[in-house]
């Protein structure tokens, strides 16, 4: 046998050994698992995600008992209406819930939940036991993360899992968050930078996380000089897609700029369109402008996010000003839920669920209103006339329209919409969705008296 022939023979023999050993099929299985997870990510959020986030109630100081209590309430009272995500917001890796001392990390600079607040994480279990509990209720589990790598990991120059690099090889110490001293940016143009994000996603996948809220990502060119962190967003998305587990990616904070719309749509399931909003009228009123700008970008698996719902009991822990009920009036709370629904924003309840009051509960369980958020289409601003605003959307499978009427003024006003504006004609029935009441049939137009800072939501037309 000639030397070239011997080489070919041994190559074929080696290939046969590999095939016979099952190594290639195993590798193919892993590839198929990654492909399956990536395909699942493409349809993770066919409708706007709904759930509860701990931040408005507990800041960075929520504990396991409180998360479980809110999860139980969600499962018992809200899951039937579509609420399913339970999200632990920031600083779960600091003992006090504030940037004080060193966070808890593993040997690769990956943050871990503190056991004084999350005792089930002891023994290196991370959030897996808590995720298992949430899943046992039929719900999905999420966590908040900050962009980048912990400053403590850089100071200790910890190794990057799966590489020869260390934290100081991938850090960008000039790339920081204006409102948190926990992290430095990561240079993802370096392979080890991507490897760090890969290691994070694999860790979260091992915990069976379903939802990641990534903060300090999408705000662009604000007075603090922050920029849209496109490379790190793409690196995180890539890491999640190769983690073997489908996970929703939510980007924060806003305002995200329209020039970045294509990128956020490609790399995330939801992204914030404004800065944080709290329970005050000026911030709520400002959301009308943001929603108008982003309406054309609403669609399956990419949802502009108008922020959490600051309803019910807020700021129980983690804030200096103590617990309070939402300062929004009842009319303003109806306006908030009406705008979020006609815009089709994700719905993430911020208030404490076990202490919820009957009025707030009624806002979260009105199936006719929630159907607008989850299943309407063609949502857009119809008109603005002084203090009056109207939005319209299509009712799927019918010729009907959903119509939201708003009064941003300081006194009651009659707000009217004509059939011509809606592309309708004839004598048409109108249903009040908030009051679950048929109002009768009307010719040519419909008008309603709307309270100051108030709203109405209606379904108009024949089925």
Region annotations inferred by a language model:
Residues 75-223:
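Aromatic-lined carbohydrate-binding/catalytic grooves of carbohydrate-active enzymes
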């Amino acid at each position: 046998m000639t030397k070239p022939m011997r080489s070919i023979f041994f190559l074929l023999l080696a290939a046969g050994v590999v095939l016979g050993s099952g190594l290639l099929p195993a590798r193919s299985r892993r590839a198929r698992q990654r492909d399956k997870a990536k395909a699942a990510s493409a349809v993770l959020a066919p409708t706007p995600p709904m759930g509860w986030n701990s931040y408005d109630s507990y800041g960075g100081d929520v504990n396991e008992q409180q998360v479980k209590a809110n999860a139980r309430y969600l499962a018992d009272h809200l899951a039937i209406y579509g609420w399913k995500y339970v999200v632990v917001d920031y600083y779960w890796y600091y003992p006090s819930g504030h940037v004080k001392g060193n966070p808890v990390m593993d040997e690769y600079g990956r943050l871990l939940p503190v056991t004084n607040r999350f005792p089930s994480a002891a023994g290196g279990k991370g959030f897996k036991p808590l995720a298992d509990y949430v899943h046992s209720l039929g719900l999905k589990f999420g966590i908040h993360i900050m962009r980048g790598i912990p400053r403590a990991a850089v100071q200790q120059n910890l190794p990057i899992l799966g590489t020869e690099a260390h934290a100081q090889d991938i850090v960008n110490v000039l790339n920081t968050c204006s409102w948190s001293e926990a992290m430095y940016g990561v240079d993802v143009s370096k392979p080890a930078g991507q490897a760090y994000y890969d290691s994070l996603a694999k860790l979260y996948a091992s915990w069976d996380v379903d939802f990641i809220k990534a903060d300090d990502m999408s705000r662009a060119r604000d007075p603090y000089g922050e920029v849209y962190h496109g490379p790190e967003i793409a690196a995180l998305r890539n890491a999640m897609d190769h983690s073997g587990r489908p996970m929703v990616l939510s980007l924060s904070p806003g305002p995200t700029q329209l020039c970045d719309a294509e990128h956020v749509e490609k790399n995330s399931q939801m992204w914030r369109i404004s800065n944080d909003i709290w329970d005050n009228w000026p911030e709520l009123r400002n959301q009308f402008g943001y929603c108008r700008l982003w309406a054309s970008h609403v669609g399956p698996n990419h949802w502009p996010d108008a922020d959490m719902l600051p309803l019910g009991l807020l700021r129980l822990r983690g804030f200096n000003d103590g617990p309070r009920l939402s300062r929004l009036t009842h009319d303003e709370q109806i306006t908030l839920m009406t705008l979020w629904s006609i815009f089709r924003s994700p719905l993430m309840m911020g208030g404490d669920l076990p202490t919820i009051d009957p009025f707030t509960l009624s806002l979260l369980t009105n199936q006719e209103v929630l159907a607008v958020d989850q299943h309407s289409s063609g949502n857009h601003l119809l008109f603005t006339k002084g203090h009056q605003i109207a939005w319209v959307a299509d009712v799927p499978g019918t010729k009907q329209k959903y119509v939201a009427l708003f009064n941003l003024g300081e006194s009651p006003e009659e707000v009217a919409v004509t059939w011509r504006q809606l592309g309708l004609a004839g004598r048409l029935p109108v249903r009040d969705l908030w009051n679950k009441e048929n109002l009768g049939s009307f010719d040519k137009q419909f008008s309603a008296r709307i309270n100051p800072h108030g709203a109405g939501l209606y379904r108009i037309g024949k089925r």
